[in-house]
């Protein structure tokens, strides 16, 4: 009986603390979020993470308590405070979802996931310089080659009236391109199928660690990330669910394409005398590039065509601009495409309206800081969701409309700082310029070679896709008719 009284007393004490004494008790949010991370678990399992973030902020305001020790912000100033250079002193990824997942998967030695400032100090100039060199020398050639080979393999345009899965085509040439630039080889389709689970496994694992955060500090879970992962695997095994591992997966470097990131990193590290940077670290960073090109860009390239095909007036304007850029597809160099304002506006608008990265993976952990006048105690997680910022009426005119024209004119009605898909500060994506190059070439070449007609017009991105930590299942089916009798492959 005494034990029951003690348990009841503890529960009452917890209830009083969470409701009245907790430093976050005054922050608005769902009632259950004061006790359990119900928001995150529900968002991840329903596949509506970005839509739910937006709904929460529309309901509760610019700062929302989404868990017992987690806040979500929806302002540009919060974005600057958390992710900017000054934020590096006040916030860390150690103990965040990203930190725990990277430790569990063995990718914590990558530039984006490293928690040590010394590691990032060594890796950033190494990776940034090699990416820039690769972009200048071979990345453009690889973009053309990967797309051309897949157009030929799919016989795109051979029958102008037969619909094709444009999204599947995009997946396959991005997989080839990812392996070319990262490891110097062509990625086989069988390898792509085995790689896909590595993209999807973090979402259910993150739900599990969110539950652990109720009972243990974030730093403790970070320290025992591999143990937490093994426990999660055991639970899934008992429940007869797949136990696909997060192991670091590589494809042997057969150097079909000698100019690749892995080889350049090894040469640059040797030249700089960085003997303490292991080959495993270089492999991990090369794998991260492969994941970035295939595992995140797949959604973005599909989203570009999803919105263009649903807005024929935008597609028509883009066609006119691209077709006037050269007399043949071979003339569509990135130097030329970078000067096409509407092409770049279409890409930027897609980044705004349908960003690849969301608040679920952009989480940081406070070291004790104030954000937008709200004190965030040490150990409390914070996030700013790109989708919510990109769809905010506070920063955009007609935020739900796909309107590339907004990027061609300066206006007080649009705050462009509310769309920064590659982050800012010391953890800004080092492959930003390569990503723009890739999108320009791939989108422009397809638009130049084919007129397109959407087939699956009833597909809805909000209703029919699954948006966890990785936005997936965006399907675009179209009829591609060659503009000339001579196909571009």
Curated annotation (Swiss-Prot):
What molecular functions are annotated in GO for this chain?
heme binding; iron ion binding; monooxygenase activity; oxidoreductase activity, acting on paired donors, with incorporation or reduction of molecular oxygen
Keyword Glycoprotein in the entry? The reply is: yes
The entry's keywords: Glycoprotein, Heme, Iron, Metal-binding, Monooxygenase, Oxidoreductase, Signal
Tell me the domain of life.
Answer: Eukaryota
Attached carbohydrates are found at 113, 348, 386
Question: Record keywords: Ribonucleoprotein included?
Answer: no
Name the catalysed reactions. 2 fonsecin B + NADPH + O2 + H(+) = bifonsecin B + NADP(+) + 2 H2O; 2 rubrofusarin B + NADPH + O2 + 3 H(+) = nigerone + NADP(+) + 2 H2O
* Pathway this chain belongs to: Secondary metabolite biosynthesis
PANTHER family, from UniProt? CYTOCHROME P450, P450, PUTATIVE (EUROFUNG)-RELATED
Describe the task this protein carries out. Cytochrome P450 monooxygenase; part of the gene cluster that mediates the biosynthesis of bifonsecin B, a dimeric gamma-naphthopyrone. The first step in the biosynthesis of bifonsecin B is the production of gamma-naphthopyrone precursor YWA1 by the non-reducing polyketide synthase albA, via condensation of one acetyl-CoA starter unit with 6 malonyl-CoA units.
* Family statement: Belongs to the cytochrome P450 family.
What's this protein's name?
Answer: Cytochrome P450 monooxygenase bfoB
List the source organism: Aspergillus brasiliensis (strain CBS 101740 / IMI 381727 / IBT 21946)
The taxonomic lineage of its organism, from the top, reads: Eukaryota, Fungi, Dikarya, Ascomycota, Pezizomycotina
Q: Which gene encodes it?
A: bfoB
């Amino acid at each position: 009986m005494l034990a029951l009284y003690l348990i009841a007393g503890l529960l009452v004490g917890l209830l009083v603390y969470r409701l009245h004494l907790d430093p976050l008790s005054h922050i608005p949010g769902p009632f259950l979020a004061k006790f359990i991370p119900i928001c995150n678990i529900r968002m991840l399992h329903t596949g509506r993470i970005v839509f739910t973030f937006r709904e929460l902020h529309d309901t509760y305001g610019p700062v929302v308590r989404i868990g017992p020790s987690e806040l979500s912000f929806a302002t540009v100033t919060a974005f600057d405070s958390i992710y900017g250079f000054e934020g590096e002193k006040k916030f860390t990824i150690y103990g965040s979802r990203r930190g725990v997942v990277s430790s569990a998967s063995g990718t914590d030695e990558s530039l984006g996931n490293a928690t040590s400032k010394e590691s990032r100090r060594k890796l950033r100039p190494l990776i940034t310089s090699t990416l820039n060199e690769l972009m200048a020398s071979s990345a453009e050639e690889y973009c053309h080659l990967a797309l051309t080979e897949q157009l030929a393999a799919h016989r795109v345009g051979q029958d102008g009236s037969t619909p094709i899965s444009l999204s599947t085509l995009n997946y396959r040439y991005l997989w080839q391109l990812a392996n070319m630039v990262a490891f110097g080889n062509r990625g086989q389709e069988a390898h792509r199928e085995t790689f896909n689970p590595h993209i999807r496994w973090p979402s259910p694992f993150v739900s599990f660690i969110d539950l652990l955060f109720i009972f243990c500090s974030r730093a403790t879970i970070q320290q025992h990330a591999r143990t937490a992962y093994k426990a999660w695997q055991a639970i899934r095994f008992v429940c007869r669910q797949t136990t696909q591992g997060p192991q670091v997966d590589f494809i042997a470097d057969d150097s079909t394409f000698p100019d690749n990131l892995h080889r350049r990193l090894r040469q640059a590290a040797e030249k700089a005398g960085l003997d303490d940077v292991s080959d495993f670290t270089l492999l991990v960073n090369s794998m991260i590039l492969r994941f970035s090109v295939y595992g995140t860009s797949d959604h973005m390239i599909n989203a570009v065509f999803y919105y263009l095909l649903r807005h024929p007036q935008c597609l028509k304007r883009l066609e006119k601009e691209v077709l006037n850029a050269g007399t043949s597809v071979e003339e569509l160099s990135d130097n030329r495409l970078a000067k096409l304002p509407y092409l770049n506006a279409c890409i930027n608008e897609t980044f705004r309206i349908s960003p690849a990265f969301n608040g679920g993976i952009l989480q940081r952990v406070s070291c004790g800081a104030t954000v937008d006048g709200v004190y965030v105690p040490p150990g409390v997680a914070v996030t700013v969701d790109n989708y919510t910022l990109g769809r905010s009426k506070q920063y955009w005119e007609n935020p739900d409309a796909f309107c590339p024209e907004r990027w061609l004119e300066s206006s007080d009605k649009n705050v462009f700082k509310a769309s920064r898909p590659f982050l800012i500060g010391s953890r800004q994506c080092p492959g930003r310029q390569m990503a723009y190059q890739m999108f320009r070439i791939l989108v422009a070449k397809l638009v130049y070679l084919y007129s397109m007609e959407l087939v699956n017009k009833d597909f809805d991105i909000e209703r029919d896709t699954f948006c966890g930590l990785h936005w997936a299942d965006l399907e675009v089916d179209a009829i591609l008719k060659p503009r000339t009798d001579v196909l571009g492959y």
